[in-house]
Amino acid sequence: MTDIAPTAPANLAWPDHFAVAHMPGSLPMGGVVPMTPIFAFREPAPRLALPRDHGLTPQRTDIELGGLIAFLISDVITQGEADAIVEASERFGYRDEAPGIQTPPGMRMNKAVHWVADEQTLGPIFDRIAHLLPHDMDGAQLYPALSRRINMYRYDAEDVFNPHTDGDWPGYGLTPDRRQMQEWAGLRSCFSMLLYLNGPEDGVQGGSTRLFRPDRGHEDVMPKKGSALFFRHGFGPRSVLHEGSRVFGEVSKYVARINVMYNFG
C-alpha cells in the first residue's frame, strides 16, 4: 500500500496521557485486576489528526459465511497512519489484563490496551468508509460516528485469541473537559471493525483472523496493513464466531477493535 496522503511529521511531540476510566480487567489465565486503566491524551495528538481524504479508494469485499455478515474493506488508512496508531498505543503501554472484557482462562492469550481517541482520528476514518457500511440493522440506523473507545491488542510470539464471539457495546467518547470517558445514550454496536495495523509486509508470521461458518467451515483473513475486517457481533446466533490465530516469529501483530454504532433510541 502506498502512503499517498501527507501525514503529520513523525517528530511531533506526543501529548501527555492519563487514565480517563478504570474497569475490572480479566487476565489471560483467569483472575481480575480491579482497576485496569483506559487511557486518553490530555489534548488531541497532532500525529493522529487524519485527513478526510487520504488519497486511497477503499473497496468492500463480502465474505461468504453461510448467511452471516462479514466483509473486508481495503485501504482504510495509510501506512503512516497505521504506524502512528501503533506508536500511540505503545505510549499508553500494553498489559496482560483487558478492561471490561470477560474471557475464560486460556481464551485471550495476548496483550491489551484500551484508549479513547479523538474525533480528528476516528471521524475521518468513518467518513472514508461510511458508504460501504450497512445503513440499517434490525430497524436501527447507522450512527454517523464510530465509538471513540479503541480496544487494541498486540500478539507477540505464540499469542492467540481462541474462538469466541464479540458482544455488542455502547458507544464511548470523552467528556467535554476530557477528564473522563462518557457512555453514549441510545446507541449499541452491531459490528466489530478489526483495523489491521501491520501484517506480513512488516514481517508478521501467522496471525490470520479465522471466521467460522455455522457448518463449522471457516474462512481465513490475513492481516493487511491499513485494511479492516467487519463482522456481525452480539449475543445471538448471527454473531460471527472467530479466532485471532497464533502469531509466530519475532514481529508482533497489532490490531485495533473499533465498534460500529447504530441508533436504537
Per-region residue spans from a language model:
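Fe(II)/2-oxoglutarate oxygenase catalytic core
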Residues: M1-F230, G234-G265
